[in-house]
Regions:
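Active-site core of metal-dependent hydrolases
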Residues: 6-129, 147
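Short, small-residue-biased leader/transition segments that mark boundaries at the very start
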Residues: 1-5
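His/Asp/Glu-enriched, well-ordered alpha-helical/loop segment
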Residues: 75-93, 109-121, 126-210
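Short, Lys/Arg- and Gly-enriched loop/turn segments at beta-strand edges
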Residues: 213-220
Length: 233
């Protein structure tokens, strides 16, 4: 039912060029579901139509989508440039230091700013498992990321959110903005900023304590200290 959709589905990622995608986006938007562009080859007109239909966010920006490219003797804008030109569209960055280089992180921050840029781990079940053996023969953990065993491509991230904040700071992003992109901005994009994303009265007490090197010293979820995270005392 409509209530079930609104309560159980918060976000849907799709390629806007797929048949029926724009109509589906309009329906989801009418139910309060966030619709995100994902794994697409859409150029400007396609992204413009997608945004107008309800695709207001971009999943895993730069990954699974082309940038400026050439076809024979002609040159075309890609999804990346089209998203930059769509002022109201928000983005997310897999800022693990591997999926995107520091220069791209700075560019995205400069053009979309902290209000429209959030950080996402895209972490697999192997998050924080660097150096550990895994049972899936198709993937390997190497260089702080999950790769296809044949080294043909990245398979996913193993980063946790603190890694993303450190990576952004190392890339030259102000700490305050890096933290906002990991808290306030994603909460607002997801429509849960009435209870998440800030340390304020009557909001959920989800708190991280970091040291000067931005390593986690303690974590609270809904006001409860997370087991085995407290290294403050």
């Amino acid at each position: 039912s409509e209530m079930c959709i609104r309560d159980s589905i918060k976000r849907w990622d799709a390629s806007p060029e797929l048949p029926g995608a724009l109509e589906f986006a309009r329906y989801l938007k009418s139910k309060g579901v966030l619709v995100a562009v994902s794994h697409t080859e859409s150029e400007y007109e396609g992204i413009k139509a997608a945004f107008e239909a309800g695709f207001t966010h971009t999943a895993h920006f730069y990954n699974g989508m082309p940038g400026f490219h050439k076809c024979r003797e002609y040159k075309y804008e890609g999804t990346v440039e089209s998203v930059y030109l769509t002022d109201g569209m928000t983005i997310e960055l897999i800022a693990d230091g591997i999926h995107l280089p520091a220069t791209i992180l700075r560019l995205a921050y400069k053009l979309k700013r902290v209000e429209k840029t959030c950080l996402v781990t895209d972490a697999l079940a192997y998050a924080a498992a660097d150096g550990m053996e895994i049972t899936d023969p198709n993937v390997i953990i190497e260089d702080g990321v999950c790769k296809m065993a044949d080294h043909s491509s990245l398979a996913g991230s193993i980063a946790t959110m603190d890694v993303l904040v450190r990576t952004m700071v190392k890339a030259g992003i102000p700490l305050a903005d890096a933290v906002r992109m990991a808290s306030e901005t994603p909460a607002r994009i997801m429509g849960v900023d009435d209870r998440k994303g800030a340390l304020q009265k009557d909001m959920d007490a989800d708190v991280l304590i970091l040291d000067r090197e931005l390593n986690i010293r303690a974590a609270w979820a809904m006001g409860r200290l997370v087991e085995d995270t407290n290294t403050l005392f």
